[in-house]
Amino acid sequence: MAERQKAVAKQEKVTISKRDPWALKKWFAVHAPPYLGGVFLAEVPATEAEKLLMRTLEVSLYDITKDISHLPVKLKFQIHRVEGLRALTRFKGLELSRDYVKSLVRKGTSKVVAITEVKTKDGMDMRVSVMVITAHRLGTAQKSAVRKKITETLLKKASEMDTSQFLKEVLEGTLAADLFIAAKKIAPLRKVEFAKIKVLKYPPEEERVVVKEAVAEAAS
């Protein structure tokens, strides 16, 4: 009898060890931040909610807006909170595709890139790269003047907005339009684009929420 029980226990152990690990996972719906309407981005699997925290997801802005002109805009979001089977994200970065950037630079024009670190009103630090395409070729002095105007305007705008408003205006094109208006007084322009954005530091309040979530998940 004892031998039979041992055999059954051994068989159960083998069955459990051979179980498909995917059967233990749950599917979580990942959503964009509120300023993008909290739209659904993707589904990701995980055995525990805490394992999703800090995971990064890359999508095109087109996936959110369904605007074909947004296909070259690549966005990175980071999961920072989980509520049930909903994974909530925060912005992590933006970058234009290389092919798109190359297509903008034509003969007889100039590309001016302004790179600066900005801080929003609520304490978000970002490194921002703005690309300006001019209507005709510029000299060194004009390029410097355009770069300076873009940098000054961007720093001022960022300091007057909280993170959500700043990113919303970046993604909607409102902020690029403001930069265009400011810099066209120096030279004729054809286009202004946010080429790259990288988050350097999140607002203190947002970081506290992430830490709190991680501690709560670890304790549960």
UniProtKB/Swiss-Prot annotation:
One Pfam family linked to the record: Ribosomal_S3Ae
GO biological process terms, alphabetically, are: translation
One example of the protein's molecular function in GO is:
structural constituent of ribosome
Q: Which residues form a coiled coil?
A: none
Q: Which domain of life is it from?
A: Archaea
Give the record's GO CC terms.
Answer: ribonucleoprotein complex; ribosome
Q: Which NCBIfam families match?
A: PRK04057.1
Protein's name in the database: Small ribosomal subunit protein eS1
Q: Which organism is it from?
A: Pyrobaculum arsenaticum (strain DSM 13514 / JCM 11321 / PZ6)
Underlying gene: rps3ae
